[in-house]
């Protein structure tokens, strides 16, 4: 493990971690709201936002799946050193990170069960860009309608149709994040 992997965590772990956690929770509570998470520079190819999400939400009890676009020795070593999180298979992971094309079919990931719907995966999707245009979002945390540029509509509609089961999404583009909880309905307006 190189020194750059060790030094690329939060500059001020308790303060940066608290601010990052708050931003992630705001994104989940306000679907479609684009926020900035510029707290660190993780190893490539992870974006600053995705690295911040992983450092904020993962610990030694968190199973993570790194899909092929983000899985390399530097990322694995960095994640292990910074969080202690273990890598696992996709169907066992609480957090899965990669590019959109790697997530299909979405039903390969944990979606919870009727007794424990919270035992589902959060998919961290690395994107080229995030814009407040595109798919119309409605549901909890949205006063009337919110818009978010998403890679497609059908997968999100199928995911929402399973509610309270399903997966949650955090989209990352550079230092920007936006979230789409499974409770959010999406339509093409």
Where does each model-flagged region fall?
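N-terminal, charge-rich interaction modules
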Residues: 1-63, 67-70, 81, 175, ...
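Internal, well-folded beta-alpha domain core
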Residues: 61-62, 73-189
């Amino acid at each position: 493990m190189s020194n750059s992997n060790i030094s690329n965590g939060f500059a001020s772990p308790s303060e940066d971690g608290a601010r990052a956690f708050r931003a992630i929770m705001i994104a989940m509570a306000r679907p479609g709201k684009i926020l900035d998470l510029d707290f660190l520079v993780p190893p490539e190819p992870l974006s600053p936002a995705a690295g911040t999400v992983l450092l904020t939400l993962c610990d030694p009890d968190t199973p993570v799946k790194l899909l092929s676009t983000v899985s390399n020795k530097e990322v694995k070593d960095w994640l292990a050193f910074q969080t202690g999180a273990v890598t696992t298979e996709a169907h066992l992971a609480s957090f899965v990170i990669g590019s959109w094309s790697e997530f299909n079919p979405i039903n390969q990931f944990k979606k919870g069960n009727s007794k424990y719907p919270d035992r589902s995966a959060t998919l961290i999707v690395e994107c080229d860009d995030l814009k407040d245009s595109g798919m119309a979002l409605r549901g909890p945390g949205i006063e009337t309608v919110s818009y978010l540029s998403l890679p497609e509509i059908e997968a999100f509609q199928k995911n929402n149709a399973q509610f309270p089961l399903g997966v949650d999404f955090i989209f990352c583009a550079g230092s920007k994040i936006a979230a789409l909880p499974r409770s959010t309905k999406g339509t093409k307006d």
